[in-house]
Amino acid sequence: GNFSFTTINLPKLALEAKGDLGKFWELYDYYIDLCHDYLLDRLKIIEEKHIYNYPFLMGQGVWLDSEKASPVDSIKEVLKHASYSIGFCGLAECLVALIGKHHGESEEAQKLGLEIVGHMRERTDAYTEAEHRNWSTFGTPAESTAGQFQRANKRVYGTIPGVTDRSYMTNSSHVPVYY
């Protein structure tokens, strides 16, 4: 199963970059690293828990190899089968903030959107290779997060047409429903 995931607010990075693609990529890499490190820190804490701390997940054999462990064993060995995901939200608004159009409106935006998602995938694939853990890129289905991120962006950057002018941003890589 998925151990945990965290989500990057893509429009925030685009707004911080102020249309500068070089700055956007720099911020994007920084936040991908931050998410990676956060998930590893969380793993260090959780893997010290025991099978008995998770009676349903571990006791019912839901996780691979949990059936081989005794109740007092650490869940560390079981967690080696888990996935660790870095997600994203608001690709459409990110693209509007960077180049003025989203991926449903122009080929240039679609190409850049694919590069943004592809870059995260390359980074998570590199983590998988280096650490022998199951890292993945996750298009976050984030109804509540999309609203929270949008409110935070609007509070900091104000109302920006196509970026912060709605009560929520798009989930993951969706084309806006209003388009």
What is the role of each PLM region?
Residues 1-81, 97, 101-102, 106-179:
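Conserved catalytic cores of very large enzyme subunits
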Residues 86-95:
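Extended amphipathic alpha-helical segments enriched in small hydrophobics
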